Design a protein with these regions (language model features):
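Membrane-interface aromatic/basic loop that binds lipid-linked glycans or pyrophosphate carriers
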Residues: 107-179
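Short amphipathic alpha-helical patches
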Residues: 30-34, 54-57, 96-100, 149, ...
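Catalytic-loop motifs flanking and including active-site residues across diverse enzymes
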Residues: 26, 69, 94
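All-alpha amphipathic helical-bundle segments outside canonical DNA-binding/catalytic cores
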Residues: 83-92
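Gram-positive cell-envelope targeting signals
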Residues: 39-40, 52-56, 63, 69-70, ...
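Solvent-exposed aromatic/hydrophobic patches embedded in short alpha-helical segments
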Residues: 1-2, 93-94, 98-99
């Protein structure tokens, strides 16, 4: 694990892949030892050095990088037979990372896409991303209990569910020739 203090003191420069890996390792460690989803949120927002994170810059391949990291988390949890604490924390971490992706990728000031292109890309991500399929299955009750003061998470899940429902209704209408 790369220690942040050494990186800051020695003013070392690493490529973005190292920063991404460091983010993943930090979060993996937190998911291992945390016993409360609320504490995970507090730790991520309070004790995190965001300046060294790759989420601060615009990258065209950021959604693909995030999906690779998420798949590693899923594989790690399944291989090591993690319990409910891990999976609850993983769902919240996943929501927070996709909210950060929404802010840092789709609404980034350096994003060259037009508003229509951003909306199409977001909808494509919602339908094709395996991690977001897991988020759509997340429990409303669990999310409400763990994040009462985080309305953006509610909006995020509501948007995912509404889009998925709308898609299912359209598929049904097309299948039954009622559209």
């Amino acid at each position: 694990l790369i220690r942040r203090t050494i990186v800051v003191e020695q003013q070392l420069a690493f490529p973005e892949a190292i920063h991404q890996s460091e983010d993943a390792l930090f979060n993996m460690q937190m998911l291992e030892y945390v016993k409360s989803v609320d504490f995970l949120h507090e730790t991520l927002t309070t004790y995190r050095v965001w300046g060294m994170s790759s989420f601060q810059r615009f990258h065209a391949d950021l959604p693909q990088q995030m999906e690779q990291v998420n798949q590693q988390f899923l594989t790690f949890g399944k291989v090591h037979h993690k319990g409910d604490f891990y999976w609850n924390a993983y769902e919240v971490w996943l929501m927070e990372t996709y909210i950060r992706l929404l802010k840092r990728y789709f609404y980034h000031p350096n994003n060259p896409q037009s508003e229509a292109e951003k909306k199409r890309a977001w909808k494509a991500l919602l339908t094709t991303c395996p991690s977001l399929k897991q988020l759509r299955r997340a429990s409303w009750k669990k999310m409400y209990q763990s994040r009462k003061s985080y309305p953006l998470l509610l909006f995020f899940l509501l948007y995912c569910r509404c889009y998925a429902l709308n898609r299912r209704v359209m598929e049904w209408l097309l299948r039954t020739d009622r559209y």
